[in-house]
Amino acid sequence: MAPAWSLLLALLLLSCNAICSLGCHLPHTHSLANRRVLTLLRQLRRVSPSSCLQDRNDFAFPQEALGGSQLQKAQAISVLHEVTQHTFQFFSVEGSAVVWDESLLDKLRDALDQQLTDLQFCLRQEEGLRGAPLLKEDSSLAVRKYFHRLTLYLQEKRHSPCAWEVVRAEVMRAFSSSTNLQERFRRKD
């Protein structure tokens, strides 16, 4: 379960160093926002993860649909955008405010919103250079279905604190693993 999550959300946190070589110049603040998201996710924890072990689930991340280990940097920008957008929406639903501190959620959404702004700029720049969208429709659909499964899980668990904790912990683990993906891209350069 963790390796699948790792690829999806690790892509979310590729820093400027991994993307800048594409001609997309994300500001230094983008990598600072990544660290801020990690800090905020840590601070959101309200339930002990060990008390929610029975609620863990395999959400079947579609690794192959997104190119797996063959994912190109240009496609990573699109994946980053897609995942960031869904993550933002995920933490913007009404049920999240019941479980977590509203001011922390606001800060998390602000950090994600800034990342979306940076990534949208890069998407427009890269699509302009290539003349076509960077993310294949199959990959986009796979990401949407994946987040839909997460939404269904929360609904099935009635947005319980443990269900939210499972999702938060998985996102946290995935964000933390982004360093490995970043190193992989650096070695390719």
UniProtKB/Swiss-Prot annotation:
Record key words, sorted: Antiviral defense, Cytokine, Disulfide bond, Secreted, Signal
Subcellular location: Secreted
An annotated GO cellular component: extracellular space
GO biological process, one term: response to exogenous dsRNA
Domain of life (superkingdom): Eukaryota
Any one Gene Ontology molecular-function term assigned to this protein's record: cytokine activity
Gene3D superfamilies: 1.20.1250.10
Transmembrane segment boundaries: none
Disulfide bonds: C24-C122, C52-C162
Signal peptide limits: 1-23
UniProt entry tagged with the keyword Disulfide bond: yes
SMART domains: IFabd
Biological function: Produced by macrophages, IFN-alpha have antiviral activities. Interferon stimulates the production of two enzymes: a protein kinase and an oligoadenylate synthetase.
Family the UniProt entry places it in: Belongs to the alpha/beta interferon family.
Protein name (database record): Interferon alpha-G
Organism: Bos taurus
